[in-house]
Regions:
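Intrinsic low-complexity, intrinsically disordered or marginally ordered coil/linker segments
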Residues: 1, 20, 93, 106, ...
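Metallocofactor- and cofactor-centric catalytic cores in central/energy metabolism, strongly enriched
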Residues: 39
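Hydrophobic/aromatic-rich, well-ordered segments within soluble, folded domains that form packed cores
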Residues: 119-146
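Short, flexible, solvent-exposed loop/turn segments with mixed acidic/basic and small polar residues
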Residues: 18-24, 59-63, 110-115
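Short, extreme N-terminal leader segments that mark the start of a protein/domain
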Residues: 1-34
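Long, compositionally biased
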Residues: 150-192
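A glycine-rich, hydrophobic loop/mini-helix early in the fold
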Residues: 43-101
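Internal catalytic-core helix/loop-beta-alpha segment
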Residues: 94-121
Length: 192
């Protein structure tokens, strides 16, 4: 699979970085998007959301870094479920997130990213990482992981390795399908 070279958000860039989220296998995905024109970028985000929202997926800019933007694609219903987990709520509550409302948690995450003092490692919860792995990463300062893949694993290695393989296969299959002219919209699975 070849790297995507683009100067604004594109279907290729999203597929390259977000296939597991598009397929409904993952709660959310992050990627850095090169941006030359902020206005065009925001128009493209609005247009993409117009197509994604009916399928239960949303894409939002999290942090503008000048020549690039950190972008978050997620499934709001799945995120609400993930952040409702008691272990996830505990991690977020310890960091003063408004745990009762998912959208306000995203606003708080954006604030922390913009603040820039320390990277908010609880971001893993917004990506669907297991709370025990997010907690382990935070508590151990990223040291002592049992396994490393899409994230550092401190809990169940076997389950994580299966997910890593699933995500990798999904990305490969989505990329191949897109290269064979499969519609971007048809690659976004509507989850109930």
């Amino acid at each position: 699979m070849e790297a995507v070279d683009t100067e604004n958000i594109s279907e290729e860039l999203v597929i390259f970085h977000c296939s597991p989220t598009m397929a409904g296998l993952k709660t959310g995905s992050l990627f850095n998007c090169p941006v030359k024109n902020n206005r065009t970028f925001l128009e493209n985000i609005r247009e993409m959301n117009r197509r994604l929202l009916p399928r239960g997926v949303r894409i939002v800019p999290l942090k503008n870094m000048g020549k690039s933007v950190l972008v978050y694609m997620y499934r709001p219903d799945r995120l609400r479920e993930d952040l409702g987990d008691s272990r996830a709520r505990k991690i977020l509550a310890e960091r003063n997130y408004p745990v009762e409302e998912t959208e306000k948690c995203i606003v708080e995450l954006v604030r922390r990213l913009e603040d820039g003092e320390a990277f908010p490692h609880e971001i893993g919860l917004f990506l669907g990482y297991p709370p025990e792995d997010v907690d382990g990463f935070i508590r151990n300062g990223a040291a002592g992981a049992k396994c490393i893949g899409a994230w550092k694993v401190y809990g169940n290695v076997e389950t994580a390795q299966r997910k890593f393989a699933q995500y990798k296969k999904c990305t490969r299959l989505y990329w191949e399908a897109f290269q064979k002219h499969r519609s971007f919209d048809r690659l976004v699975v509507r989850c109930s």
